Amino acid sequence: MEKKTIRLIVPDWQAGDNPVYYFGAKILQVIAPKKEGQKEITIPVPDDFKPLERENGVTAQSAVYQQVKDTVSAIDKEAPDKIITFGGNCLVSQAPFAYLNEKYDDLGVLWVDAHPDISNPEIYENEHAMVLANLLGAGDPKLSGLVRKTLKPSQVR
């Protein structure tokens, strides 16, 4: 039986407060090879690039929360075995990793980035630097709350 794979496009720019991230996701969507039979899902993200405000110490917290929530819903609806994610910044990984952690008991995550993404609102204001902390249940309390089964530190390298 063939595994179900989805292509998830999340052009989030608010989590990093950088409109260029939006276009990065769109470029990746176009240049990445497509395989027949893989459903492509795009999470709607505003492209007005208006200045963002802080909420609870987090840049655009409500907008970013809604995007992650919409991503969780889209993934749950499709119930894939694999997820290919193209996004503007690191936060787009939260919903896919959280879903896969629920689906697979032995999930391991190799986190490769220029910074560890283990911040919280007391340390840094942009959500893209909190994604791994959110997955571990130690980041932004609002977005960490969207993770139904947190990663254990032993699952992350």
Where are the regions a protein language model picked out?
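Conserved alpha-helical scaffold segments that buttress catalytic/binding sites
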Residues: E2-R157
